[in-house]
Structures are given as C-alpha cells and as structure tokens.
From Swiss-Prot:
This is Cytochrome P450 monooxygenase tenB. Cytochrome P450 monooxygenase; part of the gene cluster that mediates the biosynthesis of tenellin-type 2-pyridones, iron-chelating compounds involved in iron stress tolerance, competition with the natural competitor fungus Metarhizium robertsii and insect hosts infection. TenB catalyzes the selective N-hydroxylation of the 2-pyridone nitrogen of yield tellinin and 15-hydroxytellenin (15-HT), respectively. The pathway begins with the assembly of the polyketide-amino acid backbone by the hybrid PKS-NRPS tenS with the help of the enoyl reductase tenC. The chain crosses the membrane at residues 13-33. Its cofactor is heme.
Length: 544
C-alpha cells in the first residue's frame, strides 16, 4: 500500500479515531523502548533471566501476569533475596522493581524520611494525583498521622462504639432468621459491614449508617483502584491521559460525598468556632473532628476548603475499608475451610465465651479482653500470613536523593523504589512447618505450654507478644515495620476480634452445597492474591 493511500485513509478518520490512533502508536513506541531499555542498575541480576541479560524478555514480563507467585518465589528462595542479594523483578506494565534482601531491612527502617520515603512510595502506588486530584493526600497524609497520634488515647471509648456498630451491621445484612440458611456473597456483605464500622470511627453517627453515603464511599474506593490499574503500568506521558479518563466517575462520586459531608462539616465548624468550643472539649471524638481541629490550627487553607477535607476523608476511607474488607473476607473463608480438620469454629466460640465471662455485667469489652483472645489472635495472624493484603511486596520506600548506599554497596539513585518480598518470607519453610497450610492455632501453640505464658488472671504476657497479630517484624509485614508501621493496626485488631465474636457467637456458618465442603481458592492478578470472586457462604442465626 502506497504512503499516499495510507495518508488518505487517515484523513478520512474522525477526530476521536485519530487521537486514539496517535495514542496507540505512542504507547507502542514507549512500551518498546521501556521494555528493551537497560534498567537503572545494569549490574544487578534480573529474576528469571540468565546472568548476562540486561533487560527482561517479553516472556518474563508476561510471567508477572500469569505466573507471578512462582517468579517471585524463585527470586526469594532460589537465587537472591533470601541469600542477602538485591534483585530486579518485572513489575506492572513497563516497570521494574528492586527487591532488597531481608538483611537490609533494619538499615532501611533507620534511614531518615528525607532519604527513604514511605509517603512518596505510596503516593506513586496509589496514584491519588489522578483519583483524588492531588498527591498531597499521600505525600502529606496528616489525616493518617492523626490516627497514630491519638488512637491510643481514644481506644477504650472506641471499643463499645465498634461493638455496637458491628452488631447493628450484622443484624441488618445477615438477618435474624434462626430457622433457615441464608446464602450470601461474602465480600459484598463484608464491604458493607466494614464500611459501617470504620465510618463510625471516621465520621460518627448518624452518617455511618447512611446507606447512600456508605455506597458512595465504596464506589470511590473501587474507582481509586481502577485508576491505579489504569495508570501504574504506563509511563508518565500515557498516565496523563489514562489517569483523568479513569478517574472521571470517581470525581463525580467525590462531589456527591461532599454533599453528604457538608451538613456535618458546617455543624463541626460551628462547634469549633463557638466560644464554648474554645473553652471546653469541642464535642465528638471521631476522626473527622480530629481532622478539623488539626486543620484549623495547622492547615487553615484546607480547613476552609470542604472539597479538600472531603478528599482527605476519602483517603482515610481507602486505608480503613479496602484492605480490611479483603483481609476479613479471607479470614472468614479460612475459618470455615479449616473447621473440619481443626474444629476451628467451636474452639474460637469456646474462647470467646470464656473471655466474655470475665467482662462486667453488661458484657463491656476492654483492652484486656482482647489480649486474652489468643486463639482469635492466632487465627487472624495466620490468615494475614497466608493472604498478604498488599500484594507480594511490602515496606516500600522511595529514594529521595542520590548518594544513598545500601549495606551491600548498591548506590541507590533518586526515584528508585525498594521493597521486600514479604509474602515469600511469610511462607518460608525454614520458619514454618507446612508453610502453605492454614493452621488456625499455629501462633497460639507457639510456646510448649500456653498456661506457662499466662499470668494469674489468664492474661497473655510478653512471651506471646512476638507472635501477636499486631506485632511487626522483617518476616511479618502486613502492617509494615519500623517507625512507620501502620498505626491503624490496633483498631484493625479490635475490629477483627469483635467481628469474630459477633459472627461466631450469633451465627452458624457453612459452605453452599455446590462447594462440596471445599474452600474456593484465591485468585492471582499480577502480584495480588485476592479472595475468590463471588465466593459464597451460608449463614443462619443461632438460637442462643
């Protein structure tokens, strides 16, 4: 075909067809260049490639999507990370990730934030530049810093609120029928339950029970995830197009959330700016009120801008709701799946009943109540061990300035993001017997004699602390590690244990008949292991 004929055909195309064609050609050129360009670190080995190779083959790039678990397992066990060596692995789209050995963890955690930044790493990962309209929500995430600063002081007051909200949510979504089994799609229901419970902490009553607000909150979360998938695989030039397109509906939903928040915002502003509010406790203790108090003093421009405050609430929702929903869905599936072998449900019920006998006459929970729930703690940690909530890699950090040198002598360049193969470390056969098996009471059996680890009141002592759900280490990274470990993990701990108590005390659980008593397997999307789509369970209210 002559060039003139090609040009004639192009001329006949409409405007959108021409734009699409140009973007397609540019994408192919950029992808070809990126896939064949030498990485930042030509001296580092490439996982799955021969030693002399300096770029990833297309087949190895495709392994990231269809065989990522095996590829990363090879990088960890066989060749590099476990043996104290850094390695490069293929990542989403055109990108390459640097995996650090476990031996470098303590060094990395000790670096100042202006050298290695977790905030910059998560800003790049979550792409809020597009979904929320600005990178400030992760690069200056003061709404999350407030949780770290104040959670411990409000925790005791938060416990009965979470208990009340979870009880209401389960009754609403699971029902009270004690005669007939009800089939539910588990993750869908847990989205609603988690959204209601976490919103009690974030925005308080009555908004936490407003179905319109809760539905919009989760639509924004799913929209943020869509934006991540639409931008991360590509170079910045392509992201500038795909990011706004993928975030269009999310921005509309954020505007609708803002309408729900406006009356609450005006009410709280009135409290803070009233004379009484200045002299006494200005009222509610939820996160939104904490945010307004902080912004009034430290971020006055944001304090006066409901749009920005709304987006900070959306960022807090993303952290609190999304991963908790995935994790608790896996937890419940694992409990039902292990019940036949370990009598998991009855064992947990016995512990919950025994622990609750030690509460006051009203059955009020305390911090001490949770520390005594060692089997519940073990089952939650075991579920998190096998179902790493952040994909395969953990404790990401981005290098902010040149000249930083790792313990093994790698001169890290500005803009490089380092991470660790967390999920591989958590199923290391040198650390765990039958590491791929869900053993619900693995950690409550950690000592030879559990009774020796309790004080006279049956409370867990320091010997159990290292295996607790909230305890981080280089071998257990669902909540990160070091000074930036997730502060919200303590609320997650409370919420998961209350969920187990509410669910197992008040409901019988089982598999639908077509599952034939077997747990459906998780699915992989790239390096993400997710609950089986559409997984169903049976529930029935117990006659207690």
């Amino acid at each position: 075909m002559a060039l003139s004929e090609v040009l004639s055909m192009v001329a006949q195309l409409g405007y959108y067809e021409k734009v699409t064609g140009i973007l397609g050609v540019v994408s192919i050129i950029l992808l070809f260049w990126k896939l064949n360009h030498e990485p930042f670190y030509p001296a580092l080995p490439l996982a799955g490639e021969p030693p002399q190779r300096r770029w990833f083959s297309l087949s190895n790039r495709l392994r990231y999507y269809n065989d990522c678990a095996a590829l990363f397992d090879e990088a960890y066990h066989t060749a590099y990370a476990k043996k104290g060596k850094a390695v490069l692995v293929p990542s989403m789209g055109v990108h390459t990730a640097m995996i650090m050995p476990e031996s470098a963890m303590n060094w990395a955690m000790s670096q100042p934030d202006d050298s290695l930044s977790i905030k910059k790493a998560f800003s790049e990962l979550n792409q809020t530049k597009y979904s929320l309209g600005h990178s400030r929500y992760w690069e200056d995430p003061w709404q999350l810093d407030l949780v770290k600063a104040h959670l411990s002081s409000i925790l005791q007051n938060l416990i009965p609120q979470l208990n009340e909200e979870l009880a209401a949510a389960f009754s609403k979504h699971l029902g009270t029928d004690a005669e007939n089994w009800k089939e539910i799609e588990l993750e869908v229901i847990m989205r609603r339950v988690i959204a209601q419970a976490t919103s009690r902490f974030i925005v308080g009553l009555p908004l936490c029970r407003d179905d319109g607000y809760l539905d919009l909150s989760y639509k924004v979360i799913l929209g943020m995830v869509t934006t991540i998938w639409a931008t991360l695989p590509f170079p910045d030039l392509i992201r500038a197009v795909t990011g706004p397109l993928a975030s269009w509906q999310t921005r509309r939903n954020i505007s609708r959330i803002q309408e729900h928040l406006e009356p609450l915002y005006q009410e709280r502003i009135s409290i803070l700016e009233s004379r009484d509010g200045q002299k006494s406790d200005p009222g509610p203790q939820d996160l939104f009120m904490m945010m307004l108090r902080f912004a009034q003093k430290k971020r006055p421009d944001e304090y006066a801008n409901l749009g920005i405050m709304t987006r900070r609430v959306c960022a807090a929702n993303f952290v609190a709701m999304h991963q908790s929903t995935v994790s608790v869905t896996n937890l419940i599936l694992n409990i039902i799946g292990s019940d036949a072998e370990f009598n998991t449900i009855a064992t947990l019920r016995d512990e919950i009943t025994q622990v609750m006998r030690g509460t006051d006459a009203k059955g009020c929970w305390t911090k001490d109540t949770f520390t005594r729930m060692r089997k519940c703690d073990s089952v939650a940690r075991e579920a998190m061990r096998l179902n790493f909530p952040l994909g395969t890699r953990g404790s990401m950090r981005t290098v902010l300035k040149d000249g930083l040198e790792s313990p093994e002598g790698i001169k890290l360049q500005k803009g490089t993001t380092i991470s660790w193969l967390a999920s591989c470390a958590q199923v290391d056969a040198d650390r765990f017997d039958n590491p791929q098996k869900f053993d619900p009471f693995r950690f409550s059996r950690a000592s030879k004699d559990d009774d020796d680890d309790d004080d006279d009141d049956g409370r867990s002592t320091s010997s159990h602390t290292k295996d607790a759900f909230v305890t981080t280490s280089p071998q257990y990274l669902p909540f990160g590690h070091g000074k930036h470990a997730c502060p919200g993990r303590f609320m997650v701990d409370l919420m998961f244990k209350i969920i187990l108590a509410q669910l197992l005390t008040h409901y019988d659980l089982g598999w639908p008949e077509d599952y034939q008593g077997k747990q459906p397997p998780s699915v992989w999307q790239g390096e993400l292991s997710e609950p089986p789509p559409g997984a169903r369970i049976l529930v029935k209210r117990r006659k207690v």
